[in-house]
């Protein structure tokens, strides 16, 4: 069986399929830490449901493709797992999200995961001739994969503009690179261009992210405390704040895409406003400290000796 999951007739297909499943399995579980926080706090905070709704759509789309094509068991297994995981994330989000966010999530879910997917299924099965169904559906999957590649561009531009890699975790980029390589090999060995081509883009963007990370990565700096001396004026607390590393909670990296190739997934992210607010809070705190320091500035007492 050419595309079988454990086909020994083509060990290369087996190895690439297994590797792709293992790496994608880990990527699907990446948001677990985020949702543990949501569960403990009983609140979604500033987290968005968009990545999980899009990831669910991606998984069901690739499952449908694997069923129409047949002999694509690696795609079936990992995307079936992905469907379950993403559905669990969405349910948990709906439980703890505020009413407005819950309604937006439900509307987006019905529009993308129900209406859009139903339209694709009906079109494929009833309007496209059977000999062309794989080509049509593969083209839809390919177009969707390329469309979501717009997401990494935003984070790449942000890193270049700010010269900061706070929003781009290196571990995720490494996993995505390995995943893209594994799924590219699977598409190559099974002669499936619809699996192979998206991974070229996934590999490229992952390598760019890793390159930017090492280019702009800076060693962790320690905050400089305001001090005084005989020959120096008090160091500005605001200036010291510029050397301080602002710790961001887990999940605050902005809209990073997980191009786990035949399964483009949008990664965990938190609204960037949250990070901006934290930075603003840090500056405000530094300004307050500066003001307090100036108010408590030690007086210089001149002692004149009588001659």
Curated annotation (Swiss-Prot):
Compartments annotated for it: namely:
Cell membrane
Q: Which family does it belong to?
A: Belongs to the SWEET sugar transporter family.
Induction text: By the X.oryzae pv. oryzae (Xoo) transcription activator-like effector (TALe) protein pthXo1 and, possibly, AvrXa7.
Q: Which organism is it from?
A: Oryza sativa subsp. japonica
**How does the record say this protein sits in the membrane?**
Multi-pass membrane protein
Kindly state the subunit structure of this protein: Interacts with COPT1 and COPT2. Interacts with APX8.
In this entry, the parts of the chain located on the Cytoplasmic side of the membrane are: 36-47, 96-107, 157-168, 216-307
Stretches of the chain found on the membrane's Extracellular side: 1-14, 69-74, 129-135, 190-194
Residues of the MtN3/slv domain: 17-100, 136-219
> One MF term from GO for this chain?
sucrose transmembrane transporter activity
Q: Which gene encodes it?
A: SWEET11
What phenotype is described for loss of this gene? Reduced starch content in pollen and male sterility. Enhanced resistance against bacterial blight mediated by X.oryzae pv. oryzae (Xoo) strain PXO99(A).
Record-level GO BP terms: carbohydrate transport; copper ion transport; defense response; sucrose transport
Per the entry, what this protein does is: Mediates both low-affinity uptake and efflux of sugar across the plasma membrane. Required for pollen viability. Involved in the transport of copper, in cooperation with COPT1 and COPT2.
Name of this chain's protein: Bidirectional sugar transporter SWEET11
Give GO cellular component annotations, separated by semicolons. Answer: membrane; plasma membrane
Q: Which InterPro entries match?
A: SWEET, SWEET_rpt
Tissue specificity: Mostly expressed in panicles and anthers. Also detected in leaves (leaf collar, leaf auricle, leaf ligule), roots, sheaths, culms and culm nodes.
Keyword set for this entry?
Answer: Cell membrane, Membrane, Plant defense, Repeat, Sugar transport, Transmembrane, Transmembrane helix, Transport
Question: Which residue spans traverse the membrane?
Answer: 15-35, 48-68, 75-95, 108-128, 136-156, 169-189, 195-215
């Amino acid at each position: 069986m050419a595309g079988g999951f454990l086909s020994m007739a083509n060990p290369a297909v087996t190895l690439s399929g297994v590797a792709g499943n293992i790496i994608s399995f880990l990527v699907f579980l990446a948001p677990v830490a985020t949702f543990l926080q949501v569960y403990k706090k009983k609140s979604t905070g500033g987290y968005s449901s968009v990545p999980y709704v899009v990831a669910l759509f991606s998984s069901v789309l690739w499952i449908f493709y694997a069923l129409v094509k047949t002999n694509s068991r690696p795609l079936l297994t990992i995307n079936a797992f992905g469907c379950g995981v993403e559905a669990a994330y969405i349910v948990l989000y709906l439980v703890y999200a505020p009413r407005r966010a819950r309604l937006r999530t439900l509307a987006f879910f019905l529009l993308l995961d129900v209406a859009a997917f139903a339209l694709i299924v009906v079109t494929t099965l009833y309007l496209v001739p059977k000999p062309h169904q794989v080509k049509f559906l593969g083209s839809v999957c390919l177009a969707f994969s390329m469309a979501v590649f717009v997401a990494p561009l935003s984070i790449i531009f942000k890193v270049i503009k700010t010269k900061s890699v706070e929003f781009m975790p290196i571990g995720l980029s490494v996993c995505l690179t390995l995943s893209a390589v594994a799924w590219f090999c699977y598409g190559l060995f099974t002669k499936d261009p619809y699996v192979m081509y998206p991974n070229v883009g996934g590999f490229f963007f992952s390598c760019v992210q890793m390159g930017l990370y090492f280019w702009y990565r800076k060693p962790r700096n320690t905050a400089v405390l305001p001090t005084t001396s005989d020959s120096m004026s008090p160091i500005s607390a605001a200036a010291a704040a510029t050397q301080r590393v602002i710790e961001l909670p887990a999940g605050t990296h902005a809209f990073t895409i997980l191009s786990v190739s035949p399964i483009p997934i949008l990664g965990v992210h938190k609204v960037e406003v949250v990070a901006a607010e934290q930075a603003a809070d840090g500056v405000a705190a530094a300004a307050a400290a500066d003001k307090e320091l100036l108010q408590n500035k030690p007086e210089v007492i001149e002692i004149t000796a009588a001659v």
